[in-house]
Amino acid sequence: VKPIIATLIISTLCTPAALPALSLQSYSAASHHRFADDPAFIGNDYDWSGVAYDGDWFTRISDTYYVTAWHARAIGPATFYETNDPLGTTVTVGWDSLTRIGSTDIAIGRFSSSPGSSIAIYGIADETTTQATFASSSYFDMEAFVVGLNGTGGNTTTNFRVGRNEMDGFYDDVALTATNITDMITYDRDSPGLGADEAYLQSGDSGGPLFTTLGSELVLTGIHAGIDPTLSASSFLSNYITEISAIVEAGGESLTLISPVPEPSSSLLIALGAVILSLRRRVS
């Protein structure tokens, strides 16, 4: 079990601040506030409608199920925005139940009704990893979107900021407390290529999602758990797919699982075959 300064993690992300906000290298409302609804928003190519905030974070993973952090668990009604327009159409659903995944910081909640087809359901990255294998995994140095509070105050979904970071660390069995132990993926402040977008978790961000991308699709990879002085950490969902699936399937639903690295398309395979055949002909 690796304690990443457990007291600091919990107190930093759970202690209320006046106007907590995801820390960015250089914040711009146009680029980083989802509900500025600006063409410069770094997330404009993606669908953020399946993430809601009411003082804690909900991320939708099936028709009526969502994932959140156990130590900052989201319960109660959730309001989703169909677009990035703060005056746009919203969908509000009630809350039904919450189930913790073992002794981890991951919890699966259920809404009392479906938010409907206009609200995104996110697939979960299906590649597992460990501290020993992380450097050879698809995730190593992969860029990810980090969702957190915008610092505008209030327990509403419009308090929504997006930054980026590169996932460059992994720890097995991180102990937030003696009874809260989870595999975590981490990211720090040393990604100069990300410029103004580089993000670091702060108070209030616990339970928010960490997304990788595949084409124009957001792929759910982690749920924010905490920080220490040098890094941010998110609970790594892929290592708990069996447990998450069991809860969702017991309710008659299913997860969408996504490989973080796309398989070669049939057209690409055909093209490669043609190149190989051409080379063989030249040799002969």
Regions of interest found by a model, annotated:
Residues 106, 112-198, 238:
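Chymotrypsin/trypsin-fold serine protease catalytic domain
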Residues 62-63, 67-104, 114-116, 138-142, ...:
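Catalytic-histidine neighborhood of serine endopeptidases
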Residues 56, 89-96, 159-164, 219:
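Short beta-strand segments
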Residues 277-284:
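C-terminal membrane-anchoring or membrane-association module
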Residues 5-24, 249-270:
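Short, threonine-centered small-residue motifs that mark membrane-proximal processing/anchoring sites
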Residues 21-50, 54-73, 162, 170-173, ...:
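C-terminal subregion of chymotrypsin/trypsin-like serine protease catalytic domains
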Residues 99-100, 155, 198-203:
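Short Gly/Pro-enriched turn/cap motifs at secondary-structure boundaries
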